[in-house]
């Protein structure tokens, strides 16, 4: 089969390409130019493009660079900035996967006559009736959460070659065949934000910051912040302590009112989170009222048993046990209660 491999310049996508070549597929590598600004934090750098090109050369496959900077700006960077301006906590990696890698790149693969699109994500896709997205074999590197917004159309045409491998196995295999990326560190940060500049410096170039009052649950003033747009629900850093000596946690952020409400650890829990239906994506079938599921609210978050209720135009995830607050804008991935490694769907917290 003809397979287009998204090669980021990292070890996972390098091994994905190598495995497909070994299996006898007609493989072509593609690296995405996504960001025209400065970045030193991985997956968008000139060095990454060169690593991908050199690996493709080593494997004897063609390699192309696709310029998707405008799409990336429109669908990832600008929504990220806008979300912070509204006091929300976005996940740009999920949006990049949904709108760029598994939309724009998949469309390009189709138009160029490829049968499949491959990436180096640590997750699995099975095709038993419906196409199912499942957790990767390595629980410490599982990336099913960041792919949880994919549906049947995308999963039908996607292959994830390293999903059955642990990260150690990936690196060992890369070293065995002499890939230059075998020892390359994983990228850790938002790819379009440089480590030196950081989130604050990046956002400060894009939006105005506003000071805000910090109050406790009774409305009593307990402090202030210089930039309400940088505060996240659940945050404790920089929030100080109460009169009882307990650390403060952010309970809510109101950007228009320039107000941050804090409480102690006992206050910083939630029993439910609302997911507007307009933000929901279902892998196969939607969950109905009372259906059971397992929720995950961050890439490395602890899975939490829950029930799903309907409330007008939203699904409401009701946790069996209290959880840390879910910040507005965070993605909540839902997994099958009978097959906990299988993604059912995902939505964005209101």
Where are these regions (language model features)?
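AMP-forming adenylation/ATP pyrophosphatase catalytic core
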Residues: 11, 36, 118-125, 132-350
């Amino acid at each position: 089969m003809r397979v287009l491999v998204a090669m980021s310049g990292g070890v996972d996508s390098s091994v994905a390409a190598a495995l497909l070549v070994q299996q006898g597929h007609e493989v072509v590598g593609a690296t995405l130019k996504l960001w025209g600004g400065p970045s030193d934090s991985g997956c968008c750098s000139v060095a990454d493009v060169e690593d991908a090109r050199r690996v493709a050369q080593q494997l004897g496959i063609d390699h192309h660079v696709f310029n998707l900077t405008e799409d990336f700006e429109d669908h990832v960077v600008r929504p990220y900035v806008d979300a912070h301006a509204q006091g929300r906590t976005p996940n740009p990696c999920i949006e990049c996967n949904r709108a760029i890698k598994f939309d724009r790149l998949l469309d390009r693969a189709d138009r160029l006559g490829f049968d499949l699109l491959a990436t180096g994500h640590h997750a699995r896709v099975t095709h038993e009736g419906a196409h199912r997205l499942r957790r990767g074999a390595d629980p410490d590197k599982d990336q099913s959460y960041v792919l949880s917004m994919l549906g049947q159309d995308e999963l039908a045409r996607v292959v994830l070659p390293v999903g059955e491998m642990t990260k150690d196995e990936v690196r060992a295999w890369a070293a065995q065949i002499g890939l230059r990326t075998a020892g390359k560190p994983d990228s850790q940060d938002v790819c379009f934000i440089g480590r030196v500049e950081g989130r604050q410096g990046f956002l400060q170039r894009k939006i105005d910051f506003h000071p805000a009052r910090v109050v406790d649950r009774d409305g009593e003033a307990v402090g202030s912040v210089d930039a309400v747009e940088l505060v996240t629900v659940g945050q404790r850093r920089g929030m100080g302590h109460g009169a009882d000596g307990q650390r403060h946690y952010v309970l809510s952020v109101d950007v228009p009112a320039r107000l941050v409400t804090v409480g102690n650890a006992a206050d910083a829990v939630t029993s439910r989170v609302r997911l507007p239906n307009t933000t929901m994506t279902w892998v196969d079938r939607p969950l109905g009222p009372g259906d059971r599921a397992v929720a995950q609210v961050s890439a490395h978050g602890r899975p939490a048993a829950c029930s799903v209720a309907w409330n007008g135009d939203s699904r409401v995830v009701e946790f069996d046990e209290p959880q840390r607050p879910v910040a507005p804008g965070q993605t909540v991935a839902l997994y099958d209660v009978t097959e906990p490694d299988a993604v059912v769907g995902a939505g964005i917290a209101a």
